């Protein structure tokens, strides 16, 4: 299953960009990053057999284990792509939230969207590591 991060804003050559790159290189699944301008630009149309996840502070906060179970369920259920949407500084509008299959939160705090991208990359690596029985994740 393709893990596709669709993010508003250019990450450039920042420490966050280095973190994103480091984690995405370690993931054994195919990955893709699409950057859109802060305003405007078109979110790529979700292909058939895909799931859309919007990162949103009002979404569901889950453990790394539950996040891995979600990925596993989508993969084993025939989803070919998981699109992770990261909004700009003002987040997503109501229509984007309504269209998403799942709203995911990294807790009640508000995170800078560039840091949220790095956090998502790490959680994707952690989740795929859990599913591969890799020792990276330590529960408890």
Can you name each region flagged by the protein language model?
Residues 1, 29, 50, 99-101:
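Short glycine-/polar-rich loops that comprise or flank the Walker A/P-loop
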Residues 16-18, 64-68, 97, 117:
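Conserved strand-to-helix beginnings and helix N-cap segments that scaffold or border functional pockets
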Residues 28-83, 91:
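S-adenosyl-L-methionine/SAH cofactor-binding core of RNA-modifying enzymes
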Residues 87:
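Rossmann-fold NAD(P)-binding glycine/threonine-rich loop
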């Amino acid at each position: 299953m393709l893990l596709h991060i669709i993010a508003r804003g250019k990450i450039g050559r920042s420490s966050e960009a280095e973190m994103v790159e480091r984690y995405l290189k370690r993931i054994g699944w195919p990955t893709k990053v699409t950057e859109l301008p802060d305003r405007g630009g078109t979110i790529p149309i979700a292909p058939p057999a895909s799931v859309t996840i919007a990162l949103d502070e009002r979404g569901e906060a889950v453990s790394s284990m539950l996040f891995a179970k979600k990925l596993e369920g989508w993969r084993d259920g025939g989803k070919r792509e998981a699109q992770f949407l990261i909004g700009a500084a003002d987040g997503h509008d109501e229509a984007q939230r309504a269209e998403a299959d799942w709203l995911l939160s990294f807790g009640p705090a508000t995170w800078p969207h560039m840091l949220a991208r790095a956090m998502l990359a790490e959680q994707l690596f952690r989740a795929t590591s859990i599913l591969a029985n890799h020792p990276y994740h330590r529960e408890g």
